């Protein structure tokens, strides 16, 4: 099995890459190293040194005997390269972590808000369109966050999936199915509530 991990240099992506590689999957990490660039921008360093991708991949091959491939690509900017990569590398699955993932960073300034929205929404939209354009039958896993529901108690256990609700109308009550209402507390969490990742247009047809 072959898996492409978008955002595979991140704090969730790299452990996922190691886990799946250890289980025998062929792994391709796709990342533009934005987390490292943000650390440089903020002049911060991890308490645990984070090695370069080359060093990480070499160390993993030394201890496991397995290779992890790497491509430097910005998912939300380089659509044609992404389509070509999906066609050529032919993944069975794609795990999508390629998003700016810090709520405080997303609220730091107008520029940081713009970057978070541009990166997070375009990355997901490009990925969905690229999968359709590639014509491949690819399983997609996307990382969510409980923060889309806010940080105050809802007074109940938030249900999964759709809720059946009754709505009063001029013609009497009607039943509908809805998602539990989101209440994002940051620009980052707002991007996670956007439903671009639910499905491409039902009118899209693979060739």
Question: What does each model-identified segment do?
Answer:
Residues 191:
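Active-site helix of classical SDR
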Residues 39-40, 104-111, 151-155:
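Conserved catalytic-core motifs of eukaryotic protein kinase domains, centered on the activation segment
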Residues 1-89, 93:
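N-terminal Rossmann/SDR dinucleotide-binding element
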Residues 197-204:
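Conserved small/polar residues in nucleotide/adenosyl-binding loops
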Residues 96-98, 125-188:
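Conserved Rossmann-fold NAD(P)-dependent oxidoreductase catalytic core, especially the SDR/UDP-sugar
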Residues 13, 79, 104, 149-151:
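Glycine/Thr-rich phosphate-binding loops of Rossmann-like dinucleotide-binding domains
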Residues 73-119:
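NAD(P)H-binding glycine-rich loop region in Rossmannoid oxidoreductase-like domains
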């Amino acid at each position: 099995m072959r898996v492409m991990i978008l955002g595979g240099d991140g704090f969730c992506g790299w452990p996922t890459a190691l886990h799946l590689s250890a289980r025998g999957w062929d792994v391709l990490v796709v990342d533009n190293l934005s987390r490292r660039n943000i650390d440089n921008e903020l002049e911060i360093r991890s308490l645990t040194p984070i090695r370069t991708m080359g060093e990480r991949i070499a160390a993993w091959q030394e201890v496991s005997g397995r290779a992890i491939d790497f491509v430097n690509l910005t998912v939300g900017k380089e659509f044609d390269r992404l389509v070509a990569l999906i066609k050529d590398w032919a993944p069975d699955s794609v795990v999508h972590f390629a998003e700016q993932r810090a709520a405080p960073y997303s609220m730091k300034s107008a520029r940081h808000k713009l970057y978070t929205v541009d990166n997070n929404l375009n990355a997901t939209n490009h990925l969905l369109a690229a999968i359709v354009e590639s014509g491949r039958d690819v399983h997609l896993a996307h990382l969510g966050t409980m923060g889309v529901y806010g940080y105050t108690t809802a007074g109940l256990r938030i249900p999964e999936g759709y809720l059946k609700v009754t709505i009063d109308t001029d013609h009497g009550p009607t039943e509908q199915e809805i998602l539990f209402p989101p209440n994002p507390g940051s620009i980052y969490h707002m991007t996670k509530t956007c439903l671009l990742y639910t499905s491409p247009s039902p009118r899209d047809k693979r060739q």
